[in-house]
């Protein structure tokens, strides 16, 4: 897929301005909504991926799941468009003027107070999603954006699961990022709100320590979550924060907090 900055306006409405990021699934652009005269972010799906029904279904699901949720910590989705001719499928969302949490962690461990604030915001967004029957399934620093005022935004509901909907992946397919995956997911149990809370606890652990607890191949990391205890957090982490992380990352989902 290659779209130049002087490409035609998408859907007669969204003018692309500059590339924000690109990856295996496509790219995200800063754009302008010419109808409402406001800045937006536009996610473009790679045109070659539009030939795969599962990928298109997942892209639509991201739009549907996020558009039905309203919370300050959830990036708003405004519009969706199918591929048409040489134009790719696209998703229009709130433009977040800030980096992913991964960029902050790359500078080193974060203060406990800052981590608690981030976790509280994400938990609030997850509570709304879970109440609506939506489980994110891929909470990780790369899917959490921090704007200039310190507000956290949950993004990428592309692998989310909504209660009552048909699954978008084959049985036995592991969905999520191994470094943040709950132990019960490894044993084939379905994702639930407690799975998101485990992932959130792993995000908090990484923020406080500056690194993920387990490394290796995807399978080695996944098995470590199921079989090993987390390495101790730095001694500078307050005991009550340490206990919170322990609660969120309990191996048995029944021992995690009952809700976000």
Positions of PLM-derived features:
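Eukaryotic protein kinase
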Residues: 1-260
């Amino acid at each position: 897929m290659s779209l130049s900055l002087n490409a035609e306006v998408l859907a007669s409405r969204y003018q692309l301005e500059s590339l924000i990021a690109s990856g295996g699934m496509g790219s995200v652009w800063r754009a302008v909504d010419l109808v409402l005269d406001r800045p937006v972010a536009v996610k473009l799906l790679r045109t070659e991926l539009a030939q795969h029904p599962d990928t298109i279904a997942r892209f639509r699901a991201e739009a549907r799941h996020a558009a039905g949720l309203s919370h300050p910590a959830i990036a708003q989705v405004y519009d969706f468009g199918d591929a048409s001719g040489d134009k790719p499928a696209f998703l229009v969302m709130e433009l977040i003027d800030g980096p992913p949490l991964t960029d902050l962690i790359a500078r080193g461990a974060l203060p406990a107070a800052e981590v608690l604030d981030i976790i509280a915001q994400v938990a609030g967004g997850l509570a709304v999603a879970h109440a609506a029957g939506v489980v994110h399934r891929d909470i990780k620093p790369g899917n959490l954006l921090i704007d200039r005022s310190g507000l956290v935004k949950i993004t990428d509901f592309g692998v989310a699961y909504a209660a009552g909907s048909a699954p978008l992946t084959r049985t036995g397919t592991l969905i999520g990022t191994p470094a943040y995956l709950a132990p019960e997911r490894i044993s084939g149990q379905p994702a639930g709100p407690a799975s998101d809370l485990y992932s959130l606890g792993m995000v908090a652990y990484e923020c406080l320590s500056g690194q993920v607890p387990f490394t290796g191949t995807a399978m080695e990391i996944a098995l470590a979550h199921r079989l090993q205890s987390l390495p101790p957090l730095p001694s500078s982490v307050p005991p009550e924060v340490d206990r919170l992380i322990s609660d969120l990352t309990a191996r048995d989902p029944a021992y995690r907090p009952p809700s976000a």
